[in-house]
């Protein structure tokens, strides 16, 4: 019989936070994870429960309505004290200093073979309906459609001036294998798409779900462009934050890299000139910025617009029998607040 893990035996996580599954095992051993087998609906209930427990420890839902092959995680970054423990930071000041040091000393990511990559245990090329492999959510009854808002884009190599970029883009797959891809003006992705709009070329990317926590943290580093300009190595900084290089793998169907330890990956390309409405309601009215949609991080900014489109060429995933984990990341919570401010705080420092 294995000796039970006691809190007094535990040390700040290092290797344990290099992928999401081992992170959750470590959090559970620490007593910092809520786990439930009760059914939860991605429509309103996931985010409703997260908001009710805002600022508490992470929550894993093992029984998701309509999604028998997925689990859903929220609140991973909801408690700043849990974040500090995950990465071995002694306090808030230590966190800020060490992330600032990671800016100066990125660890170059390592590439592994496709046969080794957990995120490519199963491969589905040319999927008819991407939503089958996702867990779209809805926050409020004002939103007419569910959204995929927690995927982390991965742009590397020549498409990011030789560096690497991580970030969020909300998506709505209204056309099976094609979804809208909202981009914040001024962001790294906006800079990339602006360049390729002029050249009328698609941008190959991957959207990764259930990634190493350090990558989630760096995805919230938007608009720190004095410290993290185009061409920087955000994946390298994430490696420095977790204390070991991030593992990458070549995508199966496009010229892009994926986070090898992700749970699910969408491969494809962004078409800068193929712009479509995010919701059927806004399309029918042919009006941008009037009708409600995903509330966005501030809780009140969500309106439907025309956006570039993401054309999915393949979905790769960990074995679906193991129920890959989607980090749903409800907005206007301490979860996304901590993600969006922690790295920026270090950039200011």
Regions flagged by a language model, labelled:
Residues 2-309, 313-349:
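Extended, highly charged
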